[in-house]
Amino acid sequence: MGPVIKINRGGDLTKTERLEVKEPTPAGAWLVGIAAWFLPGSGHLMQRKWGRAAIMGGAVWLCFVLGLAMGGHMFDLSTGQGSSALLQVPPMIADLGAGVLYIICWLMGVGFADDPQQAARATFEYGNTFLLIAGLLNYLTMLDAFDIAAGRKP
């Protein structure tokens, strides 16, 4: 616990309170968090948490690859107007959670085409869901790696 500090509240000198002094988050934890977002699984690899890296990072990679294989569509900022453009933002943020996987696909133009034939596939919506889950799961993996590096979790 933190140090005991005597506080004068209304003339009562006998009352004491425990104040916890929070340590600042180490800079290395921020680096681990950024690396964990950028390359799924790398945050745990940097900390030599091999099992977590394989399971959590592997799940993100697997979901992303399966989502693309099923013909899923990744979201980006659309050129639409009004609420149509705003409705693209939350799924884009979820997809962006996949880090470098999203960036590479964006640079190569893979998964971003608005093709009616792609949307007609029976697995299209499953692919979308897998891509969204990959990004969201990577956010959770990133937070887990950050908490371990910050000393909040074993």
Residue ranges, per PLM feature:
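Hydrophobic, membrane-inserted alpha-helices
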Residues: A36-G41
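Transmembrane helix recognition focused on a "late"/terminal membrane span
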Residues: G2-G33, M56-P154
